[in-house]
Amino acid sequence: MLRREARLRREYLYRKAREEAQRSAQERKERLRRALEENRLIPTELRREALALQGSLEFDDAGGEGVTSHVDDEYRWAGVEDPKVMITTSRDPSSRLKMFAKELKLVFPGAQRMNRGRHEVGALVRACKANGVTDLLVVHEHRGTPVGLIVSHLPFGPTAYFTLCNVVMRHDIPDLGTMSEAKPHLITHGFSSRLGKRVSDILRYLFPVPKDDSHRVITFANQDDYISFRHHVYKKTDHRNVELTEVGPRFELKLYMIRLGTLEQEATADVEWRWHPYTNTARKRVFLSAE
């Protein structure tokens, strides 16, 4: 079983590397083609291979943009089968972190919550794979305040690491009543860059396909690379007006890393993207939107 998993993982990484190399070559050819069409200087980094790229441009035809490899897509079953989400915490959780994990379990339809106990990460991931879990969520805390969320897609990845801030739990608001567990409609806003679409896919594929008559709405709104999570239910007061009610919880997410592997491969998996906060331009740059 371990040999089979290692072989499948190697094949998956090889396909990902080939696809990334092909995408990079296609981007260089597109930059050269635009420079030739607009009669501009060829970019400095492309001048050595400009003749070879121009020769290969003759064999390119229109219509191949945006095509993805279904064999190499981690989310190829999204929309066909409902995701199976498992939620757990860091070791020795406080009572508030347990409450937050319970609220997250109600956010994702069909999710299950598991007490962490003394289980190691490797044992958790193996158990999730054996039971057909598609996504493992781990919540971290600092002195009772949730500060981190890890979303690991199984069986091969990716794994996204988020910082949590401005967390307001349902337990903090009196007389909220029960939460609807219907499959929600999703709103994603502000994810216009390539990395933004990647993060949007990681988040939205945690939810199953909703029914048309569902009155539950979950929003992921990106502004300046902070992703606001909001949870509402709506009801129609008449044929023109709709009344929105926030049911919580609410929090902000800040992405700081994406790894290509699963959670237990933290030491060996390649880093797909990492936030570098200590560079001179870190405060000015936004990564999840193309603005």
Swiss-Prot record:
Which GO MF terms are attached to this record? rRNA primary transcript binding; snoRNA binding
Where does it reside? Nucleus, Nucleolus
Q: Which InterPro entries match?
A: Brix, IMP4/RPF1
Q: Where is the signal peptide?
A: none
Report the record's Gene Ontology biological process terms. Answer: ribosomal small subunit biogenesis; rRNA processing
Q: Which keywords, in A-to-Z order, does the entry hold?
A: Nucleus, Ribonucleoprotein, Ribosome biogenesis, rRNA processing
Q: Where does it primarily localize?
A: nucleus
Top-level taxon: Eukaryota
Q: Where is the Brix domain?
A: 83-264
One short Pfam name that applies is Brix
Entry GO CC:
Mpp10 complex; small-subunit processome
| Oligomer and partners | Part of the small subunit (SSU) processome, composed of more than 70 proteins and the RNA chaperone small nucleolar RNA (snoRNA) U3. Component of a heterotrimeric complex containing IMP3, IMP4 and MPHOSPH10. Interacts with MPHOSPH10.
The record's function comment reads: Component of the 60-80S U3 small nucleolar ribonucleoprotein (U3 snoRNP). Required for the early cleavages during pre-18S ribosomal RNA processing. Part of the small subunit (SSU) processome, first precursor of the small eukaryotic ribosomal subunit. During the assembly of the SSU processome in the nucleolus, many ribosome biogenesis factors, an RNA chaperone and ribosomal proteins associate with the nascent pre-rRNA and work in concert to generate RNA folding, modifications, rearrangements and cleavage as well as targeted degradation of pre-ribosomal RNA by the RNA exosome.
PANTHER family, per database record:
U3 SMALL NUCLEOLAR RIBONUCLEOPROTEIN PROTEIN IMP4
Name of the protein described by the UniProt record: U3 small nucleolar ribonucleoprotein protein IMP4
